[in-house]
């Protein structure tokens, strides 16, 4: 686990990559250009800012309003959002609160979620909003993962890889820190401790209030301030393992400053139950010996829940490294 100590951070512009071009199709010169940019950004930072015009102002506003309505529900109601899988249902810890929806790119699954919270009638408007939003992010996720596989010469595994995952859409709320009666200055607190994501790819979108920070390879914390029509695309530990360590999953955290509540969304591509994460032979050679043992994602999550997993500098290496 990375330290929860909050060192100073600096403002920094991560690479911004445009995915809005209508000519962005596999095999096109534009595709090759963007693929090269994606690889460079992920090798350098483990993440990048993606400009994606399908996240319209109207859609972003609708998602924001839906989250306000959802988090205003009583806690016992939100606790109906349950899952047998770790870190998938309703979560609440200190300043952080979150709801999770499996396969939110499928409308029926979102309807099941709203039916949990409104048993009598569900919530058609919220269901349609979350479904449309998730659909758009899934489209971006699929493009990015295809580009990554092509970059490392393992395009023969693309269909197998894309079919081996499902999606979790997470809606997140970070409450502003409590007032300090003895200090008029803005108070800064850790909204979400430093961590790496355990899945394949994460796509994060924050609304109006910033707070996300990413740790660079040289151990500097940088403030991430994407525009309202862009998202942060980030490598997870499972992708790092699949690629035999060719890309890294960056530490990131949320710092709460001031008195405004922060809302954000996350789309997580996750290996399905029973799928074994193992580097293809094409990525293993004398210069790149195999780093990780094959493993199942759920076993990795269960390890992360143990004391050994929580205190490890890298849960992935502690769990799966040779």
Curated annotation (Swiss-Prot):
Q: Which residues form the Fe2OG dioxygenase domain?
A: 165-271
Q: Which gene encodes it?
A: AOP1
Q: Which UniProt keywords apply?
A: Dioxygenase, Iron, Metal-binding, Oxidoreductase
Domain of life, per UniProt, equals: Eukaryota
Q: Which GO terms describe its molecular function?
A: dioxygenase activity; metal ion binding
PANTHER family to which the protein is assigned, alphabetical: 2-OXOGLUTARATE (2OG) AND FE(II)-DEPENDENT OXYGENASE SUPERFAMILY PROTEIN-RELATED
Name the protein family: Belongs to the iron/ascorbate-dependent oxidoreductase family.
Tell me how the cofactor is bound.
Binds 1 Fe(2+) ion per subunit.
User: What's the protein name?
Assistant: Probable 2-oxoglutarate-dependent dioxygenase AOP1
Which top EC class applies here?
A: oxidoreductase
Role according to the record: Probable 2-oxoglutarate-dependent dioxygenase that may be involved in glucosinolates biosynthesis. May play a role in the production of aliphatic glucosinolates.
Q: Which InterPro entries match?
A: DIOX_N (IPR026992), IPNS-like_FE2OG_OXY (IPR044861), IPNS-like_sf (IPR027443), Iron_ascorbate_oxido_reductase (IPR050231), Oxoglu/Fe-dep_dioxygenase_dom (IPR005123)
Record: residues binding 2-oxoglutarate: 262
Q: Cite the binding residues for Fe cation.
A: 195, 197, 252
Which Pfam families does the UniProt record give?
2OG-FeII_Oxy, DIOX_N
